[in-house]
Structures are given as structure tokens and as C-alpha cells.
Amino acid sequence: MKHKIKHIHFVGIGGSGMGGIAEVLINQGFQISGSDLNGNSTTKRLQCLGAVIHHTHAAENIQSADAVVISTAIQPDNPEVIAARERRIPVVPRAMMLAELLRLHQGIAIAGTHGKTTTTSLVASILAEAGQDPTFVIGGRLKTVDSHARLGKGEFIVVEADESDASFLYLQPVLTVVTNIDADHMSTYEHDFNRLKQTFVEFIEHLPFYGMAVLCADDPHVSAIIPMVSKQVTTYGITSENAQIRATDIRHDQCKMHFCAHIGVNGSARTLDITLNLPGKHNVLNALAAIAVGNELNIPDEAMVKALATFGGVDRRFQQYGEIRLPDRRSFTLIDDYGHHPAEIAATMAAARNAFPGRRLVLVFQPHRYSRTRDLFEDFVRVLSSADALLLTEIYSAGEEPIIAADSKSLVRAIRVQGKIEPIYIEHINELKSAVHTVVQEGDVVLIMGAGSIGKIAPGLAEPTMKLTLITG
């Protein structure tokens, strides 16, 4: 039956989770087409690989398709979805298509509210360094291969497992990681945090009897579900003394981290001296998760150490543009990051302060979704108030309708009441560049954050100026 599927169409193919799957399928020999209203680097790359890309949503786009793949961002009234259902063309959720890829490999699925993309990239890099030639599908562009995805010849596939719509329950990996559990996408779980935790347990229980769950013992909510898990478990952490894989002697070195990784699993014990080419304690935890996976798969220590030391990074994950000089000779350090949850913002700001101690931190943030802003409003106010200067643009709706008192102006008012900083509200994102140039002082660190259209701002900030030095680690 499967051989009848030759042409697969993706609705919203430019999305990070969609483009990676499409690329793997192209490399497997499938004919791929897709639609996306806004072209981006993903659609351009797919076109170069042979995909047919449409920049409209229209019924005729799926004319010869044997299956249509959709993400949860695609609404039921999309004309391509309507046409597919009318013609009885299978409409396949993105996670179900990802599950098909896992069925053909030994699947490693990285789950958690934060850190999925970086951890997935670290695991893929460790396997590649060990000569395992893994397939991977990542939510960001891995710089070493200039892609979200790659079809390898080895037995392993490494993927992100998305809890935002509970679609990770489609996946049946042999090894899984849970980095943390935090309040996000709570409408999926009817605003019941216990239901969210229970869904993670259900995800872990999809492992086969010989499978392994790698769980972060430092995260209180992950620790809370460990007694509910019947599968084999390896724990990791920094502060948890009972973790089987621990980091000690952690040192910041500009945009790198040094630490000792103590591995005590199955009665054996050894220590690795690690240099991680990423900043921040949160990335030390991500590296420990990757080490735990490598240890379970018997990856040589030398390969793990080298992969972490030479890790090339992921687009928009503490992506450094170096020192930028303005025409009036003021210079500042520019960093771009995808983080959009208060916990992610706090961790990234801490990493920036440790990497560039004593320098003023200017945060430029675009909130993502009205519902997230409403649900985490007080956390946003607290975290955003800790910047030295704040530029806040209007919310990127991601298709949501506005919610009263859950917009950027409301955040600005609440932050102003705190009295710590005077936030600057920028209504139109195309005004951000000039606003940054106005606010920035000599020696500042400018941190751009958000998951929406703000991703286009950092390249524009760097373009017309003179790069002094590019800091790579």
C-alpha cells in the first residue's frame, strides 16, 4: 500500500517543523510540493532540492497529491484542506508523518517545554561525530549542515517531540529525553497542569520494554513524574545529588561553558572534562541530556567530548552577530534568540550577562500569542523588568484573536508600575531598527528575542553597519 504514495503536499511548508520532514522525504525520493504565504530560507532551500512551492493557498495546489500534511497552525477552512477532504486525499497531521519516519529507524525523541531544539542538535552532533550518520529533524537550522534536517544512512533518527498540541503521543521512539515541564500551551490541556504532566508520562510509556527515558532530575515537575514511569530511567542534573549524570565545577568562559560530567550508570563511574561551545547553565543541562543519550548508545567518550567542544550552534539560539559599529562609531554586541517564554528569556539573559559581564543588557522582545501573554502575564512582567533597557513591540498573534489586557501595551504599563526600568513600546516592528539605534549605548549587549516576525530584525540591524569582530565562542 505504501508504495502508492509518491507525491506529498505540505500546507505551511515553511514552518520549522514542516520543512525538515519535507527535506527528509525529498531525499527519500518522494515528490514534494507545499504552500506557504511567506517565503523564507526553508522554502528557498526546499525549492533548490526540487520541491514545488506555492505562495498562495488554493485547491489546485494539491491537484496530483497522494497525501496532504498539515500542522496544527493550519485551520480546517484552509482551501487546500477542504479540497483534500472532498477528494478523499489523506490529510495527515505533521506528527503522524514524523512518526512514519521514526518507524523506519531507531527513534530518539527529545521532549520538554524548553531546550528541545538545542538538545536535539547536540544529540545529532554527538552521533555524527561517532560516525553513526543519523537522520535528524530539528526545529532550527543546524549550522554545521545548514539545514533543519538530514537523511543519514545510519540506524538512528533524532527528532523533536512537540507537546504544544499533544501530538508527540503519535511518536513511538526507543529512547526519549524530557528536559523540563513548564506551563505553556495550556489550552491544549484545558489549563490543567496535572493533565500536562500526565501526558508526558503517557508519552514516556510509549517506549518499548527495552527503551530508556532520560529525565532531568533538576526540574521539579519532571522529578515529580519519575515515580509514575514504569520504563527504565536515567536521570541527569546539576543541583540534584541523586542524578546519575551530573555536572560539577561549572565555569563560564565568555560564550563557552566548562564543567566536569560525572557518569554513574549501571554500577560504573567515570568523569569527562567538557568544554561546551554554548553559554549558560541551561545549556549545560542540555549537554548532560545529550551525554546521557550518548552513554546509553555506547558512544565513545572522545566523540561526545569533541562534539560538544566543536558544536556549531543553531540559528536563533543565542546566535551571535558579533560587535556591530554604527556610523557614529558607537558599537554594541548583537545576539538573536528564539526564546519567547519567561523561563527561556530569563535563562538567555543570564547567559548573556555571564558571557559579557558588566555590560548593559538591552532586551528587544516581541511577545508570541495573546494566550501565552495572558497565561504568563506576571512572569513576563517580572522577567522583562530585569533587563537594563527594554524595547517591546506588539504581539505576534500566530493567528489568535486579541485578548483584552493581554497585549504589549498592558505589559508596558505593568512593567512601568514595577519602577525598575522605563520600557519603550514600539507599535510597528519595522520601526525597531531605528529605535535600537536610538537607544543603544557604547558597549551594550543587544538581545533580540521572540518566535515571530522579529526573527528578521537581527540581520537587518547588522546589515548597514560595520562588523568589528565575530565572536564564535
Swiss-Prot record:
InterPro entries referenced in this protein's UniProt entry, alphabetically: Mur-like_cat_sf (IPR036565), Mur_ligase_C (IPR004101), Mur_ligase_C_dom_sf (IPR036615), Mur_ligase_cen (IPR013221), Mur_ligase_N (IPR000713), MurCDEF_pg_biosynth (IPR050061), UDP-N-AcMur_Ala_ligase_MurC (IPR005758)
Cysteines engaged in disulfide bonds, as pairs: none
Binding site for ATP: 112-118
E.C. number: 6.3.2.8
Organism: Nitrosomonas eutropha (strain DSM 101675 / C91 / Nm57)
The protein's annotated pathway: Cell wall biogenesis; peptidoglycan biosynthesis
Gene Ontology, cellular component aspect: cytoplasm
Gene3D superfamilies documented for this protein: Mur ligase, C-terminal domain, Mur-like, catalytic domain, NAD(P)-binding Rossmann-like Domain
Catalytic activity, reaction form: UDP-N-acetyl-alpha-D-muramate + L-alanine + ATP = UDP-N-acetyl-alpha-D-muramoyl-L-alanine + ADP + phosphate + H(+)
Presence of keyword GTP-binding: no
SUPFAM superfamilies attached to this UniProt entry: MurCD N-terminal domain (SSF51984), MurD-like peptide ligases, catalytic domain (SSF53623), MurD-like peptide ligases, peptide-binding domain (SSF53244)
Family to which this protein belongs: Belongs to the MurCDEF family.
Role: Cell wall formation.
Molecular function as annotated in GO: ATP binding; UDP-N-acetylmuramate-L-alanine ligase activity
GO annotation terms (biological process): cell division; cell wall organization; peptidoglycan biosynthetic process; regulation of cell shape
Principal location listed in the UniProt entry: cytoplasm
HAMAP family given in the database record: MurC (MF_00046)
Cellular location(s): Cytoplasm
The protein's name in its UniProt record: UDP-N-acetylmuramate--L-alanine ligase
Keywords annotated in UniProt: ATP-binding, Cell cycle, Cell division, Cell shape, Cell wall biogenesis/degradation, Cytoplasm, Ligase, Nucleotide-binding, Peptidoglycan synthesis
